[in-house]
């Protein structure tokens, strides 16, 4: 069952973005193509016009999956840069629990000094991989 999790999940994600064919047709083609994993007998696929059309539609599905995964990676970079790096840089109060500082201080000035240095350290730590990736691609 573990072996089928990723292909089946990918199939249903791809089918979600496909509007030209029905789920039943795609599922039948998917199961026929992957049936050799469950049994020792081999199935000879028929090369009908409908089968070729379904295969072409599946190629369109894979291109949509690639685009979806690309969007996820772009969103991850945006989230890393803006939500983490920028908000740590401007000392966002929402991220105070993520700072590696002590919970008790003797004075307010000690707290502000420790919090500011921790914010700056986290901003540089989060921003460093993004800068390395950006400069490595040049």
UniProtKB/Swiss-Prot annotation:
Its main location: membrane. Its EC number is 3.1.-.-. Residues 97-138 are cytoplasmic. Keywords: Endonuclease, Hydrolase, Membrane, Nuclease, Signal, Transmembrane, Transmembrane helix. One of its GO terms (molecular function) is RNA endonuclease activity. Residues 25-75 are extracellular. This is Ribonuclease kappa-A. The lineage of its organism: Eukaryota, Metazoa, Ecdysozoa, Arthropoda, Hexapoda.
């Amino acid at each position: 069952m573990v072996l089928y999790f990723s292909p089946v999940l990918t199939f249903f994600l791809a089918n979600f973005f496909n509007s030209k064919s029905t789920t039943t047709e795609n599922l039948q083609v998917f199961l026929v193509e992957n049936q050799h994993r469950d049994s020792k007998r081999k199935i000879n696929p028929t090369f009908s016009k409908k089968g070729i059309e379904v295969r072409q539609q599946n190629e369109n599905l894979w291109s949509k999956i690639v685009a979806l995964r690309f969007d996820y990676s772009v969103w991850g970079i945006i989230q890393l840069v803006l939500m983490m790096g920028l908000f740590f840089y401007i000392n966002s109060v929402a991220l105070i629990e993520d700072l590696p500082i002590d919970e008790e201080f003797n004075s307010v000035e000690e707290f502000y000094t420790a919090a500011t240095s921790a914010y700056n350290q986290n901003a540089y730590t989060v921003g460093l991989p993004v800068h390395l990736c950006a400069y490595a691609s040049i």
